[in-house]
């Protein structure tokens, strides 16, 4: 009886909180009421102690970590905002940290937004926020002409730029508030560390980065710690990963940024930081993808083979030392045999990402079964 009364009280409090947000603010010229996204749930972060709500690295790292790594920490790759609304229209207004541009990636992927809706337990793409070409501040209608019905939404943030402010606009008669459904399930995230590829280079929009595809496939929060050109086995990143309270699985996918000698010199020490903090959490080690350009580029072919040999030796060293909860994904599996999955021979297109997910997901699922930290446990 007491537990039923407590559940009723919690539900009533949740409804009250939901209604309270609904009446805040006055409509602007476009007829919409804008809400600061920090009023809702922000997911996909290893820590909340950041300079801005949408940074990935702790504020304490500003003076201690490498400048290049710190800069990429401002990029909001993998971070999402979860909210619920019955508005027939949803618009976003956001300001980018850098106003970044790259000549081999979609602007929507670099500094746009990506909206998904939860329908019958599955997440579906709903609309993309296209960034302004000339200004750091952008406004875009993500979806419109819907029936007035309460729905759960997830808004993925920019992959290769940061977000300094974000507002969600809904019509004046609507309610909007924090989500009432725990999806992706939080509490025991998968923590993935890697390179520009893991950060999202070079998918068409934020929801297509492979950490987000894995997140939706498993209905589990995934933390994206991809740092373009800077997955160099820095110990402060290992310490950040280790600080996650109840990780389900760690993934080390750093080989594309590490020469063979760096892998040999630093991998075990990086791994030990994770293992000392979480003795039983599985670690998945991923090889360097076999790029299509290896067929003709002799120097690249020899370099990648050397890196993968070093990565395999690292894995085997752990196994010989008695580590049982370590898993390995071969580079041969990461791209389709035809290799039509990159934009420039290195960075993945949406097609390449689907190959990657197909290759790594079975191993991650296997590791999850061995993990002591399970969502809902």
Segment roles from a protein language model:
Residues 211-224, 316:
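Short helix-loop-beta junction
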Residues 1-6, 18-189, 366-377:
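N-terminal secretory targeting modules
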Residues 189-192, 221-225, 248-253, 282-286, ...:
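Structural recognition of the beta-strand scaffold that forms the well-ordered cores
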